[in-house]
Amino acid sequence: MIKRIAQTAGFTGLLAALLLTLLQSLWVAPLILQAETYEKAPATEAVHEHGPGAMTGHVHDEEAWEPEDGWQRVLATTGGNLVVAVGFALMLAGLYTLRAPSRTSQGLLWGLAGYATFCLAPTLGLPPELPGTAAADLVQRQTWWVGAAASTAVGLALIVFAGNWLLKLQGAAIIAVPHVIGAPQPEVHSMLAPEALEAQFKIASQLTNAAFWLALGLISAWLFRRKGENGQRA
């Protein structure tokens, strides 16, 4: 079983990471590069002078290493995506041991659940941001993000698997808790990039992550079932 999980996660993570990198390179990265031109423009130096804590999420360190545009950035992005994709694929394969998909298409439902948990729900309070956008304290944002993802995971599990309607309602309430509390916000809302570019970036990020999660769910379900069938024949 461990071999089955590892093989499923490895191949799924590799394919999903390559897909994510391709979509990011073609759609998301150009928007980020365009936003960086506004952040680095000399005319915007005065815009950087915000009130205390207004830009705590974007402190710049000229000495910090950053991958250069081109192959370095693509390679760094691919490596990061691979680690994340394999980790999520391991999670899905582990869940399949508890409730194995009877059809490959059920992997799409698991992918949708992953997208809702780790992307959609957290970004309702903390939408993806371009460089030069004001943000709240990093630790506070990370804490809220983890809480939103955990609440969504528990809530969805109760809604889908609980047989009691009261538990299903409790699941919906659990999902809503972090959003009722509210995500941490900066003292002053400001951004250097145009609003139209920000809107394009949010759409691109959501659709790219949706494609990633659907691919992750579909491929992992197919591989998990295939490995199981091969094991039974052996």
Q: Where are the predicted features?
A:
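Juxtamembrane/disordered regions of integral membrane proteins
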Residues: 1-234
